[in-house]
Amino acid sequence: SDVYKRQGADMNLMRSDKRPVAEVDYGFVGDVKEVNADLLASLIHQGIVPVLAPLTHDKQGHMLNTNADTIAGEAAKALAKHFEVTLMFCFEKKGVLLDENDDESVIPEIDRIAFKGYVEQGIIQGGMIPKLENAYQAIDAGVKQVIITQASEIHQGKGTRVF
């Protein structure tokens, strides 16, 4: 299959709104509002693998930086209307960890109750919180499963399964 390298802004694949200034001005950061699921599905049906960079636009010509996990989650949610989708978040760790200093302390499965408890205990913090929030939003939108893992372990079935 061919690889189609694009950003969310290309071909109007994704439209975002500039994040409003509240306590913090995030600058040119976009929150995804719309995904062209039919176009993404059409590319896949043509044997094209879309690779999306985390840049979107606001329909007024402004490019916006968008969280990469959000781009992946929004694309997965849109594609779940056309396909059975597994969303895989790949990053430098082997999965969600009980101890951020112990790479072997991978939590094999995590549900919403455990997630909330780990956040309250300070075990899950920082960037892992929005990653898991994106995972649960994807599941709620029909994504079959979400796996958080290291890219090197993607085909080994390792990591954390989110449900």
Model-derived segments and spans:
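C-terminal catalytic "cap/lid" subdomain
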Residues: 1, 5-163
